[in-house]
Amino acid sequence: MPPKLPDFANISERLRKALRLEHRIVVIGLSDTPPANLPHYEGEPLKACQMLDTVRFEGKSFYTVQNDHYECKNAIRWLGFDESYEGHFSGEWATGDYPDNGRALFRAPAFSRRMYEESPKVRVGTVKCAYYMPLEKANEGPARGDEVAIFVLNPRQAMYLARGTLYSRGGICYGMTGPGTCQSVIAGPFCTRQPMYSLGCFGARQFMKITGNE
């Protein structure tokens, strides 16, 4: 018999009340097979981080495949769908001239390479679909252990969440800011199985509906 799952709707309600969250907590799973009980995403082309907003604000559940993620060539690699584009891991793109020849995020390619070498990465080819759902509906999903929960918080809420995770295990909290948000808050905890805190990235703050204090 499969193990009995927690009551995710109750957990979501308690977390949102304790943290005073206005919007939903998002669950995203990285899997090799599409879940049979979720619909395929059929909306307008979005980046992986923008899809988080679809869940946060609209409460939708869906799965995506590789072809749904070409709006962001960074997420294609970080989520384990496909190989990187030319100039990505070499650091040339991250130091090139904006907008057509790069993003000028680093002064030298070596600095970009250091970031990527130190960042968690999902192995390419191991992911065939990414599925999204609100935490309160997670009992309707496959719950195969390949999911992570994503909270969009202000500093005070983040502090309380961090202290709460340490209450029953001790230690310290780790964060990662530098890579894309999809790598920091999706690939990071997926690979390490540890909570990961991030200030986000330029792309997420441009394309997601994140306020200045989140």
Task: Label every PLM stretch briefly.
Residues 3-214:
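Acidic, serine/proline-rich low-complexity intrinsically disordered regions
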